[in-house]
Swiss-Prot record:
Record carries keyword Transmembrane: yes
Sites carrying sugar chains: 163, 169
Entry keywords, A to Z: Endoplasmic reticulum, Glycoprotein, Membrane, Nucleus, Transmembrane, Transmembrane helix
General function of this protein: Probable regulatory component of the nem1-spo7 complex which acts as a phosphatase and may be required for proper nuclear membrane morphology.
Record protein name field: Sporulation-specific protein spo7
Pfam families, per database record: Spo7 (PF03907)
CC per GO annotation: cytoplasm; endoplasmic reticulum; endoplasmic reticulum membrane; Nem1-Spo7 phosphatase complex; nuclear membrane
Regions crossing the membrane: 36-56, 68-88
Amino acid sequence: MSSYVPNTLSVYHNLLILEASFRKTYLQLQVRRQKYMAFYVSLLVWNFYFGYRVFYRISKYSLIDLTYKLCLLCGIVTLLLFYFSGLYRTTIVYPSRYVQQVNKAMRFFNIRLVITPVPWFQVRKPLDCGVHLILSSKRFDILVIEGWEAFRSSYFASIHRKNNSIQSNESSESPSSKQN
């Protein structure tokens, strides 16, 4: 038997691809969760408002009172459909448990997915926002872990430099030079 030791750069590259895949899925799930959470909150506000108008502030006009009751009924039916169709679970509950489920699946490989918090007021998000992979010291040597962190940070630094050079080239070109 020959003991095959894989090239560490190819392993780092594959880990980077895996991390990018996890990051993309995590960010997509967070956007979907925010969208449906806004829908869910607006639906709750809708039901509370029309419930208040139907039960506590009854209108003296029967047509307006009937409209309030129909709006409340539509809101309750929509809320029940949202729960019983499974949309609540797949759009709000599952995205918040994504990292836990990935960590359970990756436990065998001694790799963890960790959320990197980014301030909400930061306009330009870094390239590695969302999540990143951490190698466990149980299975991996300290040199491999440090090599992975160095490879990862140098990769994102090179991507950042490339994006900055592209932006500076685009901003340095003037509209008059493009027309000539």
